[in-house]
């Protein structure tokens, strides 16, 4: 059997129909000889180090993709087997290397921002698994976000634009999302949800169906205290980001985060006026909105904090990018430098944990493991709980298909990835699935429900809180 990325390419592509790809016209413009080779790239501004022109081929200011970043790919293909969409489709242009070819071709003026170009970029999850694999340090996530910014400025088709207007007008705004969730709670409790699902009334509307299938029982959450003092020896003062989805759908995660941090010796400040961190906007290329939200968040938190604690992987990853997108001198960048995932602080504490007799497995949220490089801390915390047997999840860092709002925009691809994730969970015989991101929790819980798996899907702080007791 052939080995390496090239062998994986052949194996994954083996089941596809023969004949030209639907994307062949654009692929031929990027790869005239039908192969992915660097010699097909022409000489242009992208090949001149240090050049930052006002216009770069099909791209224009502001927020041009970095020419040095585009040039840094050496076309080795190590990223290909790590890319979820490439694993599913086996298409070069739906791999990191292929997408970089498209971006670079557009930057060199050999390719315009066409619907086909946009489609390949839209199918990317932005999981950054390619960055973890890349020996050259290609900043794929930043290049993707900048390119999506270019696409957004060009405008979308009416259907996509309407869906994005709904999503971005609702999810990042807790004051709007809260009333919407209360209506959804009525939908659930009235029996209407059971009727809609039994009759499959949403089958003709895949994106709406995907949104409805994610629904969990909407909890009744209370407001967190503005300050909870440390218990015992004081270690310092932290602020808690409550998030948008987290505070409304998983309020218990925030409440237990405060309790655990307090028991670990931290004063916990939770500003009631804090808003969205902008993660969804960054991933979607809405860069001006992202910057505005970042500035507002920085103003909401006092400067006299040792750390900003985040318990949602997507939020933490986006906040750590503030310096890049707003400049290192910006107040938001100072907040980013203080940002820590909750597991990074709790792993330093010596909490008295009681036994939990269960089998658990851990899913690496993409924006925790690839976006922030946090892999060992959550596992170390779970391993400390007496009686809890931690079983490694096969392909633990393969995206579950949530990816922010990807599962709403691209439900078919998201479901294919979710099916593979649930297969792996079932293989562990675990009764607890642990993940550090609310989007992953919703997505994986949906998959386990559909499969009929008796698996409880929890955040790491929920498991630790059970072991800590009252």
Model-assigned labels for residue ranges:
Residues 66-86, 114, 118-138, 397:
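Cysteine-centered iron-sulfur cluster-binding motifs in ferredoxin-type domains/subunits
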Residues 31, 140-470:
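Iron-sulfur cluster-binding electron-transfer modules in prokaryotic oxidoreductases
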Residues 57-70, 110-121, 262-265, 385-390:
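Short, intrinsically disordered, charge-biased short linear motifs at domain edges
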Residues 104-119, 221-231:
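Active-site-flanking structural segment that lines cofactor/substrate pockets
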Residues 77-81, 91-96, 267-272:
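N-terminal glycine-rich anion-binding loops that anchor highly charged ligand groups
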Residues 47-59, 86-116, 137-165, 453-463:
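Non-heme iron-sulfur electron-transfer modules
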Residues 50, 71, 89-90, 105-114, ...:
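Signature of N-terminal electron-transfer/Fe-S-associated modules in redox systems
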Residues 1-50, 54-55, 62-68, 92:
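Conserved glycine-rich FAD pyrophosphate-binding loop
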């Amino acid at each position: 059997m052939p080995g390496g990325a090239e062998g994986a390419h052949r194996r994954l592509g083996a089941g596809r129909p023969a004949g030209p790809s639907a994307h062949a016209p654009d692929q031929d413009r990027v790869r005239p000889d039908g192969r992915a080779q660097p010699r097909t790239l022409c000489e242009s501004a992208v090949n001149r180090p240090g050049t930052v022109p006002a216009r770069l081929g099909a791209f224009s200011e502001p927020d041009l993709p970095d020419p040095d970043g585009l040039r840094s790919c050496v076309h080795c293909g190590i990223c290909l087997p790590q890319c979820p969409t490439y694993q599913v489709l086996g298409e070069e242009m739906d791999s990191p290397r292929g997408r970089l070819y498209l971006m670079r071709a557009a930057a060199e003026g050999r390719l315009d921002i066409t619907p086909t170009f946009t489609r390949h970029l839209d199918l990317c999850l932005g999981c950054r698994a390619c960055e973890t694999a890349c020996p050259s340090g290609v900043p794929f996530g930043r290049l993707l976000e900048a390119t999506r910014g270019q696409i957004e400025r060009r405008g979308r088709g009416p259907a996509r634009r309407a869906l994005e207007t709904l999503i971005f007008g609702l999810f990042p705004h807790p004051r709007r999302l809260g009333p919407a969730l209360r209506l959804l709670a009525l939908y659930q409790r009235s029996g209407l949800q059971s009727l809609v699902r039994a009759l499959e009334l949403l089958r003709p509307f895949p994106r709406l169906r995907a949104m409805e299938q994610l629904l969990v029982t909407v909890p009744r959450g209370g407001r967190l205290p503005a300050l909870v003092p440390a218990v015992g020896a004081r270690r310092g003062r932290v602020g808690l980001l409550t998030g948008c989805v987290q505070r409304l759908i998983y309020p218990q995660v925030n409440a237990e985060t405060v309790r655990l941090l307090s028991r670990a010796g931290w004063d916990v400040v939770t500003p009631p006026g804090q808003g969205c961190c902008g993660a969804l906007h960054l991933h979607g290329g809405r860069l001006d909105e992202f910057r505005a939200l970042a500035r507002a968040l920085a103003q909401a938190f006092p400067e006299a904090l040792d750390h900003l604690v985040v318990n949602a992987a997507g939020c933490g990853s986006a906040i750590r990018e503030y310096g890049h997108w707003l400049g290192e001198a910006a107040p938001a960048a100072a907040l980013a430098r203080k940002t820590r995932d909750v597991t990074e602080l709790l792993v330093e504490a010596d909490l008295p944990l009681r036994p939990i007799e269960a089998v658990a497995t851990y899913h690496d949220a993409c924006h925790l493991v690839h976006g922030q490089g946090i892999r060992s801390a959550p596992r170390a915390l779970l391993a400390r709980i007496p009686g809890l047997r931690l079983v490694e999840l096969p392909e633990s860092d393969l995206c579950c298909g949530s990816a922010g709002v990807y599962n709403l925009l691209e439900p078919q691809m998201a479901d294919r990835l979710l099916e593979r994730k649930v297969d792996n969970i079932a293989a562990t015989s675990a009764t607890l699935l642990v993940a550090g991101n609310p989007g992953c929790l919703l997505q994986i819980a949906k998959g386990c429900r559909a499969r009929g798996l008796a698996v409880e899907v929890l955040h790491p702080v929920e498991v630790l809180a059970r072991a800590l007791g009252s």
